[in-house]
């Protein structure tokens, strides 16, 4: 059955196995020597996991070996529903980009020129920062600047 499993079904198995075994996302990331958020995102179906690393994770999670090629296959990225997210944590990122997205775009254009921040040549990090009024969540997006290049196909 697992060989015919979809990536979404495998993701559900990963979440259940991780909880059942009492593993943290950090422990899984450490097992393969990859960053925490990359590993978590990959295990949630957003990045392909090289087979040699997939084998380590499958073993650690107690999953069938036939999960390895499913993990290694290029995923359908951005698989979140297109509606406004309802999960409170994810919604706060949506809300923050509604409030600050325009300003971020303007300042990127002012400091870098006309272009975008890559989400392909990209990393993300999360840190916990102690604060007297309550711990802070510090999220860092680190993406390569990609200038728009308007080129005619006839050139």
Swiss-Prot record:
Its EC number is 4.2.1.104. One of its GO terms (biological process) is cyanate metabolic process. It catalyses: cyanate + hydrogencarbonate + 3 H(+) = NH4(+) + 2 CO2. The keyword Lyase applies. It comes from the Bacteria. GO terms for molecular function: cyanate hydratase activity; DNA binding. Pfam families: Cyanate_lyase (PF02560), CYNS_N (PF21291). Keywords: Lyase. It is an enzyme of class 4 (lyase). InterPro entries: Cyanase, Cyanate_lyase_C, Cyanate_lyase_C_sf, CYNS_N, Lambda_DNA-bd_dom_sf. The active site is at residues 92, 95, 118. The keyword Protease does not apply. HAMAP family: Cyanate_hydrat. Catalyzes the reaction of cyanate with bicarbonate to produce ammonia and carbon dioxide. Belongs to the cyanase family. This is Cyanate hydratase. It comes from Mycolicibacterium paratuberculosis (strain ATCC BAA-968 / K-10). The gene is cynS.
């Amino acid at each position: 059955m697992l060989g015919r499993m979809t990536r979404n079904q495998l993701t559900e198995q990963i979440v259940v196995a991780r909880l059942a075994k009492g593993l943290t996302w950090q422990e899984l990331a450490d097992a393969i020597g990859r960053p925490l958020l990359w590993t978590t995102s990959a295990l949630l179906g957003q990045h392909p996991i090289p087979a040699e690393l997939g084998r380590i994770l499958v073993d650690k999670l107690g999953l069938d070996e036939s999960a390895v090629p499913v993990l290694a296959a290029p995923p359908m990225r951005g698989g979140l529903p297109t509606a406004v997210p309802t999960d409170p944590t994810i919604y706060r990122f949506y809300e923050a980009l509604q409030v600050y997205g325009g300003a971020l775009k303007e300042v990127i254009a002012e400091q870098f020129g006309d272009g975008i921040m890559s989400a392909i040549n990209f990393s993300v990090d999360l840190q916990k920062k102690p604060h007297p009024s309550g711990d802070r969540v510090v999220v860092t997006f680190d993406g390569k600047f990609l200038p728009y290049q308007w080129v005619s196909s006839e050139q």
